[in-house]
Amino acid sequence: MYSEALLSRFYEPVRAGDLSGSTSSGKQGNPTCGDVVEIAIRMNDGIIQQARFRTLGCAIAIAASDLICELAEGMTVTGVHVIDAAKISEALGGITAERWQCIAAPLAALQDALSK
């Protein structure tokens, strides 16, 4: 059973959609279950001003994408390293280790966007 925190982000993600004027975007797939995540960011002076996502995947992947975008906003490129699977899992009410790949895809998409 999913937590209320996860279901809330799954049913009503705040940061889903396109980001006009994005400065970079990254994409990552999850070969285990087929999730595909794209995260677009807008940077200004080394700070992530906005982040938006488009995810085709499970409830965990969508909720994690939304939370990762929220946490990334206001952070520096080097500061986002504090966002990890354990932190996301805890914030979403505890995700079993078998499903952490659903968190890894949006994290990798963010890193891909930051590497460009």
Predicted regions and their residues:
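Domain-level signature for proteins that mediate thiol-based redox and metal-cofactor handling
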Residues: 1-116
